[in-house]
């Protein structure tokens, strides 16, 4: 449908589709109609009459999430607008808060932390040369996205009308769906980001072999080009190291330098890596969040590796930047 030219798609969770199909086949027609109605009302509740909006929030906001009351109207308006026009609003944010000199400083710091990871790999005593070579190849093949995308989305085809909040919401939803469907059968849009420049976060994308740092996280207190380097390496440097390390954690380590699931470890090295991971799991299992509740180390392993390795290589990068000085 929708003009798709490809008859092949990658389904990450086949069981979800099978389960959904089974549930739909068993459900009475009226139940399916009711489900679609409820989903539509919840999706557009914010721009429907107040009674519907309040009912939707009472369930999704208060009952399910524990939020006692809605945000102020203007904040909700900002959230709605930035969701519909993310790139256009992001361009304004970048112009105001991320000047070229800040991007240049961030580019340099990311490069330094990536290089520190390479030196760390070289120093590993438990990893054999062939595995080190593959790990270094993976590191060298990273794409680093810093601040904002090289290409912005075009919203000229989106029809926005004053005084028509519901219509704008529905047209925006349709516009987004058609944009996503338009990717079918086409080349991979490597320039595309999966997080807006206004987001205070960062991410590692295993399939694309990339690390991404939006402009909003490259701000104080994480990053300030005028601050002492130690502050920046301890702040954003640890975040950069964290995302780099995700590509080599218990999940990221399953992907090769091309972003493909592949077994690139020697059996001996993989065994040593898994043993180290098990030790970290056991360490975190001992941490008590509050009386009687312990961290489940197996569930947090990837983040724990990211935190531990990330801070370590950020420190290494800072020490290296001193050029031997103390």
What are these regions (language model features)?
Residues 107-237, 244-326:
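Zinc-dependent metallohydrolase catalytic domains
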Residues 1-108, 112:
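Noncatalytic, helix-rich "gating/capping" subdomain that lines the substrate-entry/channel surface
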Residues 82, 86, 90, 241, ...:
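Amphipathic alpha-helical core segments of compact helical bundles
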